[in-house]
């Protein structure tokens, strides 16, 4: 190219109007709520950009944007144009000098058609109320101190106004299968969780500003939305934020944007930052991580060892603050314990230990490296050393009081925390796999246990601290104590003795009642043992009743004879003229006992019918079983 041609091109470029500002479609959408045709915004409150749209293109120099503060002459703002597809032309003006941008003063702006000498549109605004901040930059995200926590820090493009901005965080799990972008799961809205980053010229903001409670985004469950739909947000007022409730071991994406706080400065939400991804460490509970101390000086941590993988433990101490001062803690190696059987087999647990103190919080991190070389991180819950005191295994002693009734005693492993120690006792029958667990009261040193007689059991005991001063994990179970309960002979002897005592007491009570209260004794005796009736009196009454109900004539039958006998009357001799009495006295008569079966049909006539009234025989035998023997004598 000739030198003169290069000179002309350079001159044309220098003389051409500069494209002073560019307004993106995203900026236009953020200002959609502004109904003014002439729209303005400020990124840092030290600049000002205004624009408007025209449907028809116009020659260069047709329009002019003028501005003026009160009692000042109008000045023109240099314009640049942008072609808008299917719409027209967009005219943009950016104030050239920072001194022309003043806060808290009304600014009068109007658009003038130079050729027609007409005002196209006009507006009065305050620069401090049209803020549209740029998205935060240098966003850093990492796992927090708790499993499922995410710690985010960022820097503001304009640090001078960062104290007058509030921030919004949007995040969600990263889905590698979705090539169009991550699906927004949930957004949280709350107040600040940590204050702004501490700068060299500022005061200790970490100690001055309070911290809000961490949010729980997954408390109500995830809610899937479309990629274009915005959900709720997490609001913060500083350069760091700590959120919780995420799923440990998952990957997340996040974005940030800012807005004037509405108190000192006003405006609209700015655009979202570029997405940042972060991998959260897994929960060390999956490895069975357990840390404890026996002497409040040395801490031992153990976790399950995985096959074909190596692991390493790390720790660091932090002060008790709501917002962490150390954004990027320095992890120290936890000294690994030597294996007792190297090369024989993979141990079940990996162990490491380190020295600690009781003036800071302990954080534990375990890194597991698999055979392909992939590193997986697992984070444990932070703890104080007095919350991880592990007691030695207690000793269990027992003795059988009676059949199936045991008295248990155990020796307290720590006399300095006897009232803060709780126990668990479990037992099972021989040949059974199910354990029954009992929890004695806090601080108990013994108890009783009732088991089935003539059975065999296994008993175990363990202890842990659970008081206001010390806490810790459960100790290991004691060695199984085998118990064989006795038979129920003692119970039978007890019942027999009880019956004897009750019987003797009853006899003594009756004797005492007879001696002290005879009348009550007689009533009690008649109530318990009624007297037998008089048999003679009862029989006599029975005979009288039977005679009254018997017929006047009775028949006597003698089954021993074939011919029925007849009643004979023995008359005296004719020489004896003296009449004999019809019935003599009982003392002068002989009686012959007859069989009752022979008297069934025999008619008896003790008193003849010719006898006078009142001369009936006095020897009336009611049962008709006897007859006078003299009546049967031969004449």
From Swiss-Prot:
Signal sequence residues: 1-25
One GO MF term: thrombopoietin receptor activity
Residues bearing carbohydrate: 117, 178, 298, 358
Function: Receptor for thrombopoietin that regulates hematopoietic stem cell renewal, megakaryocyte differentiation, and platelet formation. Upon activation by THPO, induces rapid tyrosine phosphorylation and activation of JAK2, providing docking sites for many signaling proteins such as STAT5, SHIP/INPP5D, GRB2, SOS1 and PI3K. In turn, These signaling cascades lead to the proliferation, survival, and differentiation of megakaryocytes, ultimately leading to increased platelet production.
Topology feature Cytoplasmic, residues: 514-635
Binding partners and assembly: Homodimer. Interacts with ATXN2L. Interacts with JAK2 and TYK2; these interactions increase MPL localization to the cell membrane. Interacts with THPO. Interacts with SHIP/INPP5D. Interacts with BTK. Interacts with SYK; this interaction negatively regulates THPO-mediated ERK1/2 signaling.
Annotated motif WSXWS motif, positions: 474-478
Alphabetized PROSITE patterns for the sequence: FN3, HEMATOPO_REC_L_F1
Box 1 motif, short sequence motif: residues: 528-536
Phosphotyrosine carried by residues: 591, 626, 631
Annotated protein name in UniProt: Thrombopoietin receptor
Tissue: Expressed at a low level in a large number of cells of hematopoietic origin. Isoform 1 and isoform 2 are always found to be coexpressed.
Membrane topology annotation: Single-pass type I membrane protein
